[in-house]
Amino acid sequence: MAENEGAGNQPVALDIDTLEASIEKSRMQRRRSARISGILYPLAVVLGVLAAWEAGTRLLGVPTFLLPPPSAVAGSLRANASLLLFHGWVTTIEIVLGFVLSIAIGIPLALAIFLWPIFSRSILPLLISSQAMPKVAVAPLLLVWFGFGLLPKVLIAFLIAFFPIVISTAVGLSTIEPEKIYLARSMGFGSVTTFCKIRLPNALPEIFGGLKISITLAVVGAVVGEFVGGDAGLGYLLMVANGSMDTQLLFAGIIALTILGVALFLVVELAERLAIPRHIIAGDNATHLS
């Protein structure tokens, strides 16, 4: 009898294993399909816009200095590749240094805001007020104080980029389920151990959300600095192209700046995936299942 019952349970176990394998395979297929569609759909939109742009400028006879066709912009990209690479490298250095400075100051500042409520009540109004101040108005002062070198551009990138890091880090450290803290205390964790093993990992998604916003704002800050007082960089190149009415080079510089910004954003996103892969996977699964 026992042997018959054991034999009767085997098909049920096999059916459950088969069902789980089928569900996992279906999830993988949905993820793959979502990745492909996430690439193909935007690409189709871009190609459609470029085709309409090319056809419209040629059929309507729009002057090149007003709106060059994409083919002319592509030609300018090829012809000025070395120039764009040189100025792009200068802008990249300014962005990265401003971004690193934002992290080096923003995260400790957020930690102080989280740890000391009095400090938080004192400093937060000043931080919010600083964001209401237009950075373009501050840029000439930085040029007067620090000259026309690299430092003013880095500082402008920092001033624009550090605020999201401060806010997202402070929110991430403050937002945690009380049950996790109770569990850590019941296991005998001290304050430092609880912070390092529970609170900080829990805050990583919020922190990286702020970092991704910050890196895009650092691009804006570097370009603003180059507009005001640069002698190199993509922002400076855009000013030169605008002054000489070289619209093709102007569009080429905008494209190069866009590619640079997207590339830096993807670097931060890759760091996020390496630091918190479970969070990313869980987010993807929730998106696809919904």
Which residues fall in each region the model found?
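Hydrophobic alpha-helical elements at and bordering transmembrane segments
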Residues: 77, 84-88, 92, 122-130, ...
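Generic hydrophobic transmembrane alpha-helix motif, especially the helices
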Residues: 127-164, 171-175
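Transmembrane-helix boundary motif in ABC transporter permease subunits
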Residues: 98-127
